[in-house]
């Protein structure tokens, strides 16, 4: 990752020209260099920032985009680019600096907005919208999963969020281990026997690697992490009632590693239900782990979920399970499903 300098905050100028009604090409000048950014008109400002981050390493939350005669519209991450009249003669300006060192202070970690629940019918609608499918296909073409350890044939896949799932990222402590969810290593050790493990966070890869290293997850002798995914793997989807928001499409993993993972052998834990709106059948909404100092002696979520994971691992296909009822699932359910 490029390092920041002591020079004044760099700015980026972008000229745009349409290739088709759907695709835009932005020439971005940043820090003395020019980059070409291709983006579709049905993408959002959030996606534009994500693309710029991929090229410049300026995190989306550090970017300020300016464009003549539209006021502060570009401060709205949910705004669709199709609503802006780009002209080749005008330039967009991005103000932002590269972060060389991540601030470990928990108050500096990314904000998590309140979760909301989509109705069952609308969740299906979001998943099946052609515009959202197109966004997923584009992300599949753009993103590369770097494997830390080889995928294991015959193993199921467990995808885990970080913030409020494995770690209380808002409380403060002298040692990050004090904010780790209880029984994390025992949980991952047990799960690893039946599942490959991937960590997917809505933050930068640098922050993911730092946090997982601090918690002792990446160098644990009892289990291995197959891959880490960051915010660049996410997509922005459109909902009729909730507008535009980011989510984590498991279809990305299934498309890039089809010989190992599929809807029938994958489960994802996240405290935000909307993150698996593109694959609701595979998501389990975990109880958020907040206020670690007050709750770490009583939180048993990972203990109970360990039993659930090991129980359903006996099934050949997980796609028919209702993970919202996981607490009432038992060995008897497995036997009954085998007999069906």
From Swiss-Prot:
What's a BP term from Gene Ontology annotated to this protein? regulation of proteasome assembly
Chief place of localization:
nucleus
Provide the species name. Answer: Arabidopsis thaliana (Mouse-ear cress)
- Residues covered by the Ubiquitin-like domain: 24-101
Gene3D superfamilies recorded: HAD superfamily/HAD-like (3.40.50.1000), Phosphatidylinositol 3-kinase Catalytic Subunit, Chain A, domain 1 (3.10.20.90)
Q: Which Pfam families match?
A: NIF, ubiquitin
Cite the residue spans of the region called Phosphatase.
151-312
Instruction: Show the domain comment.
Output: The Ubiquitin-like domain mediates interaction with proteasomes.
EC number(s) on file: 3.1.3.16
Q: Where located? A: Nucleus
Cite the SUPFAM superfamilies for this sequence.
HAD-like, Ubiquitin-like
Which residues does the UniProt record annotate as the domain FCP1 homology?
151-312
List the catalytic activities from the record. O-phospho-L-seryl-[protein] + H2O = L-seryl-[protein] + phosphate; O-phospho-L-threonyl-[protein] + H2O = L-threonyl-[protein] + phosphate
Keywords noted in UniProt? Hydrolase, Magnesium, Metal-binding, Nucleus, Protein phosphatase
List cellular component terms (GO): nucleus
Q: What protein is this chain from? A: Ubiquitin-like domain-containing CTD phosphatase
Which terms in the Gene Ontology molecular function aspect does this entry carry? metal ion binding; protein serine/threonine phosphatase activity
Required cofactors, per record? Mg(2+)
Q: What class of enzyme is it?
A: hydrolase
